[in-house]
Amino acid sequence: MSITRERKSELISEYCLKKDDTGSSFVQCAILSERIRNLTEHLKVHKKDFHCRRGLMVLVCRRRNVLQYVRKKYGDSEYLALIKRLGIRDIFH
């Protein structure tokens, strides 16, 4: 259910804004999206895992807050480019 260290470093290198950028909002969204995908796959098999379902909702809310910050700080163009790269739906338009 959690992502491996190698996968996390791949996401960081793919979404970083500059070298050694591990905490930018783009990287945070990418890592949260990967964790959400993993939990979604887990819940397809284990339908009654309500503890996991609650954790998934927490991650979705956290990603939504980070996406709101990206949209506010960087503008609609960067926000739309990020959600297109992540392959998720637009929640604001």
Swiss-Prot record:
* GO terms for cellular component: cytosolic small ribosomal subunit
InterPro entries reported in the protein's UniProt record: Ribosomal_uS15, Ribosomal_uS15_bac-type, uS15_NS1_RNA-bd_sf
Stored Gene3D superfamilies: 6.10.250.3130, S15/NS1, RNA-binding
Q: Which domain of life is it from?
A: Bacteria
Task: Supply one GO molecular-function term.
Answer: structural constituent of ribosome
TM regions (residue ranges): none
SMART domains (alphabetical): Ribosomal_S15
Which GO annotations describe the biological process of this protein? translation
Query: What's in the keyword line of the UniProt record?
Result: Ribonucleoprotein, Ribosomal protein, RNA-binding, rRNA-binding
Keyword rRNA-binding assigned: yes
HAMAP family in the record, alphabetically?
Ribosomal_uS15_B
Indicate the family of this protein.
Answer: Belongs to the universal ribosomal protein uS15 family.
Q: How does it assemble?
A: Part of the 30S ribosomal subunit. Forms a bridge to the 50S subunit in the 70S ribosome, contacting the 23S rRNA.
What is the documented function of this protein? Answer: One of the primary rRNA binding proteins, it binds directly to 16S rRNA where it helps nucleate assembly of the platform of the 30S subunit by binding and bridging several RNA helices of the 16S rRNA. Forms an intersubunit bridge (bridge B4) with the 23S rRNA of the 50S subunit in the ribosome.
What name appears for this protein in its UniProt entry? Small ribosomal subunit protein uS15
Taxon lineage:
Bacteria, Pseudomonadati, Pseudomonadota, Alphaproteobacteria, Rickettsiales
Annotated gene: rpsO
